[in-house]
Amino acid sequence: FMTLNRRNFLRTSLSGAALAVGSTALASCSSKSANTAKGEKGSDKPGKDLELKLSFQEGIAPGESLNEKLDFMEKLGVVGFEPGGGGLASRVNEIKQALNGRNIKVSAICAGFKGFILSTDPAIRKECMDTMKEIIAAAGELGSTGVIIVPAFNGQVPALPHTMETRDFLCEQFNEMGTFAAQHGTSVIFEPLNRKECFYLRQVADAASLCRDIN
C-alpha cells in the first residue's frame, strides 16, 4: 500500500481532478504551463517553483474578533481570507483596515446572497440577482477573486425543471452577473456540488460548459 503522506495525497488528488476535467482540457494546456512546472530555468524537477497557497473561511479561524482571526492565520502562513457575503458591503472598510500591513488578501467570497437564481418565482430570482450584485460590488472593492454561487440547493423549491430551456435561462442570468462582476474587477465563481447537496451543476464539466457558452 502507498503511504498517504502530504505529497502522495496531493498527487492523487490532483490526478483525480485532472481526470474529472477530461482529456480535452488537458490537451489544451500550453507549452508555457509545462515549462512553468519544470521551473523558469528548465529544471527537471517537476513543481520546483510551484507554491501552495492556503485560504481560510472567516468562520474557520479561532478568535473573538477579525484581527484575532487574522493573527492566527498569519502565524500559520495562511495568505487567503474568505469572508461571507452576507452584509459584506457594510464591512468593506473594516476588512480593509484589518488586512492593512498583513500578508493576507481576500480570496473568494462565500455566497451570502438571498433567494436563488433557479426559483420559479420571479421575485425570488430578482432578490438573488440584486443581492449578488451588491456582494459582487463589495468583492471588487476588496480585490477578491470572485463570489461563489450555487444555482439551487436541493432544499430550495419550487425550482425550474432540469431542461435545456432552464440551462439557457441560467446562461443569461450568469452572463448578466459575470458582466457586472467584470465591471467591478472581479468574477462569479460556480461551485459544483454532489447530488446530495444540489440538483443542478453537479460536475466541474457542467460548470466549464456554462462558462464556455456564456463566453
Report each predicted region and the residues it spans.
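C-terminal segment of N-terminal export signals and the immediately downstream linker at the start
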Residues: A25-G63, D71-F72
